[in-house]
């Protein structure tokens, strides 16, 4: 069966969103403290954690054709779209789109990149969903956890830009960077600019992925996202048709409801 952007899928992580993932870059300027891709690259000796913010294109950036794929293609999944890789990103994305594929664009968006993409992808609007990630409305919290990424207001502005240009839009609040009440505020802050869905998920494996020097901040996240907080969040939004739950939330709900 052909999968739509928000079809129910079996699996966790990116498998909840797409059948296929693509990337053309190793490293990410956002340099998020909790990044799974940075942790994995360091673990498998592909790129030192301290070098993760230095972006480098991979051989996938040089492809000249792309096949028609069943389901949704998520591109990128382990890096972001930045001025460094924007030209290559647009070129590869167009290869994906011209074969009729549906493209899920996940990003902590920069205005300069979004403005270029909405022009470059004109005519493919029906095949694209922009899903922009933001975990808080608080600038200081965003700057701490995501030091190289755009601040929340710029990301919300990008939602407005994409929606106004006729594209479908979605938000990923994964990871949540605060607790129930601030996440509720964030949902309402972005809701006017969302055409499709808002996904919510916890910060995963923070003790494993975040440097030990930030242990106090990790412990605060764990407190703000304890089972009681998550259940309060779930009860608040459980009947909201726009809200979708990531696997980290579903696990808590299943366990607490047993």
Predicted regions and their residues:
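Conserved residues at beta->alpha junctions
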Residues: 26, 107, 247
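Short aromatic-enriched loop/helix-cap "lid" or pocket-rim segments at secondary-structure transitions
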Residues: 34, 210-213, 256-258
């Amino acid at each position: 069966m052909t999968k739509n952007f928000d079809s129910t899928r079996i699996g966790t992580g990116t498998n909840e969103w797409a059948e296929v993932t693509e990337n053309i870059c190793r490293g990410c300027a956002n340099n998020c403290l909790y990044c799974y891709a940075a942790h994995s690259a360091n673990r498998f000796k592909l790129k030192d954690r301290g070098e993760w913010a230095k972006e480098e294109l991979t051989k996938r950036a040089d492809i000249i054709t792309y096949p028609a794929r069943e389901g949704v293609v998520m591109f990128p999944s382990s890096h972001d779209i930045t001025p460094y890789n924007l030209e290559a990103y647009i070129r590869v994305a167009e290869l994906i789109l011209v074969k009729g594929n549906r493209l899920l664009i996940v990003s902590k968006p920069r205005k300069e990149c979004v403005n270029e993409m909405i022009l470059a992808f004109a005519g493919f609007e029906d095949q694209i969903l922009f899903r922009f990630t933001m975990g808080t409305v608080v600038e200081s919290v965003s700057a701490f956890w995501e030091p190289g990424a755009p601040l929340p207001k710029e990301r919300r502005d990008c939602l407005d830009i994409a929606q106004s240009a006729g594209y479908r839009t979605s938000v990923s609040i994964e990871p949540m960077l605060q607790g129930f009440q601030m996440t509720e505020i964030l949902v309402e802050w972005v809701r006017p600019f969302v055409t499709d869905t808002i996904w919510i998920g916890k910060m995963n494996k923070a003790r494993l992925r975040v440097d030990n020097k930030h242990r106090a901040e990790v412990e605060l996240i764990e407190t703000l996202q304890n089972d009681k907080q998550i259940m309060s969040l779930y009860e608040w939004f459980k009947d909201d048709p726009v809200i979708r739950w990531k696997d980290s939330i579903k696990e808590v709900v299943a366990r607490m409801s047993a």
